[in-house]
Curated annotation (Swiss-Prot):
Statement: the UniProt record of this protein carries the keyword ATP-binding: no
Disulfide bonds: none
Protein name: Probable glycine dehydrogenase (decarboxylating) subunit 1
GO molecular function, one term: glycine dehydrogenase (decarboxylating) activity
Enzyme class: oxidoreductase
UniProt keyword annotation of Oxidoreductase present: yes
Length: 435
């Protein structure tokens, strides 16, 4: 379509309508030193090969998961992704961000979503799951909103050991919503449950396990305390930890959420990933997002539909349970493929991660980097260092990436199944040399 600019008369009319004198006033919130005061100097167009060459050169200076060694934690991890995962999600039948608006035409997509939901239920021990959310943080926030819809209470308890980004997203959701967020302090790296005193009018308690530091929380005690007060328990979990830890169902979680990146999704510079969301059948009509259901057609054949569509696109906005629309379904599909391939091996995988992270933590302590707190952990752990940022930068210069930095003297280290003994021993050698 040919570009037709606005006429001077149209621009004048629009500026008058919004009470401005000139176009520059539209951008008054941008610092003047950041504004370009000349015409763009753009070269002529490139052909395809020139464009490819440009991006090859640009990409060559950026380390990827195969050219560096990652011990990065804090929410995104360098896990193994089977080749079949990328192959299957790239099929043209699946490769789209959308579930079609006439969704029942795409029976393969809906069946895959149904299978994904079934796998999440099996993993968490819960009765029903939705078709995924944007990420783990939005899943936590939607769980809090759901809890308030269920019991009508407007106070939310959140552990300080929950990932700070999750807490920040929850505070963003709080804008325009009438509810109060209270935080439970941490003590020695885990939630101080002795502070659970005034639980009146508390809608739910949000805890993460393993928590932001990688430490394991007392989820049984937390569940008992909040349920005695008449609130709901929201558990944010690492799905791979469930191969070796109790399922959330076993300690009485009402809603189970989490970040799904570790289930067959690459790090991808932080996203896109997806959030999983599972709960009890009693709460199915309060659940956000879309959900695939199995039924039969008029001829008795098994078919799949989007069921209980309580999104704002389908019913009156004030009656909707969420405004989740184009979710990260393609990434959830990757997790369904991953779980189908790896599901039976999750206990072995979890034990491998546990053994390797324990080995590294013990060895680092022996060369002067002890645990920040003595707690049980899974996959990641915080260590003490004289200058955490300096250690992080020096290791990066050698192609080894650790972090994030928690404070001046503490940084996280994560160990996945991709980290070999050779990787870990080299990291130990490098860090010993920095003492």
């Amino acid at each position: 379509m040919r570009y037709v600019p606005h006429t001077k008369e149209e621009i004048k009319a629009m500026l008058e309508a919004v009470g401005l004198r000139n176009v520059d006033e539209l951008f008054s919130d941008i610092p003047t030193e950041a504004l370009l005061k000349r015409h763009l100097q753009v070269e002529g167009g490139w052909d395809e090969e020139q464009l490819r060459a440009y991006f090859r050169k640009a990409a060559s200076s950026i380390p990827d998961a195969n050219s560096a060694v990652y011990f990065l934690g804090g929410g995104v991890y360098d896990h193994y992704v089977p080749s079949a995962v990328d192959k299957i999600i790239a099929l043209p039948e699946f490769y789209t961000a959308y579930t079609p608006y006439q969704a029942e035409i795409s029976q393969g997509t809906l069946q895959a979503m149904f299978e994904y939901q079934s796998l999440i239920c099996e993993l968490t021990g819960m009765e029903v799951a939705n078709g995924s959310l944007y990420d783990g943080a939005s899943a936590v926030a939607e769980a809090v909103l759901m809890a308030m819809r269920i019991n009508g209470k407007r106070r939310v308890l959140v552990s300080e050991c929950v990932h700070p980004d999750i807490i920040e997203v929850l505070r963003t959701y709080q804008l325009g919503q009438d509810f109060e967020i209270l935080t439970l302090p941490q003590k020695e790296g885990v939630t101080d449950l002795s502070e659970l005193e005034d639980l009146s009018n508390v809608s739910c308690l949000v805890m993460q396990n393993p928590n932001y530091y990688g430490f394991l929380e007392n989820m049984n005690q937390a569940s008992e305390l909040i349920h005695k007060a008449g609130g709901l328990f929201v558990a944010a979990v690492d799905p791979l930890s469930l191969g070796v830890l109790k399922s959330p169902h076993e300690y009485g979680a009402d809603v189970v959420v989490g970040e799904g990146q570790s289930l067959g999704n690459h790090m991808s510079y932080g996203g896109p990933h997806f959030g999983f969301f599972a709960t009890k059948m009693d709460y199915i009509r309060y659940m956000p997002g879309r959900m695939a259901g199995q039924t039969v057609d008029v001829d008795g054949r098994v078919g799949y539909v989007l069921t209980l569509q309580t999104r704002e696109q389908h019913i009156r906005r004030e009656k909707a349970t969420s405004n989740i629309t184009s979710n990260h379904w393609l990434m959830a599909l990757a997790s369904a493929v991953y779980l189908s391939l790896m599901g039976g091996s999750l206990p072995e995988l979890g034990q491998t991660i546990l053994n390797r992270s324990t080995y590294l933590a013990q060895k680092l302590a022996s060369v002067g980097y002890p645990l920040w707190q003595r707690q049980y952990f899974f996959k990641e752990f915080p260590i003490k260092a004289r200058d955490a940022e300096a250690v992080q930068e020096a290791l990066a210069d050698s192609g080894y990436y650790v972090g994030p930095v928690i404070d001046e003297h503490t940084l996280l280290v994560a160990v996945t199944e991709k980290r070999t003994k050779e990787h870990m021993d080299k990291l130990i050698e490098l860090m010993e040399g920095l003492r």
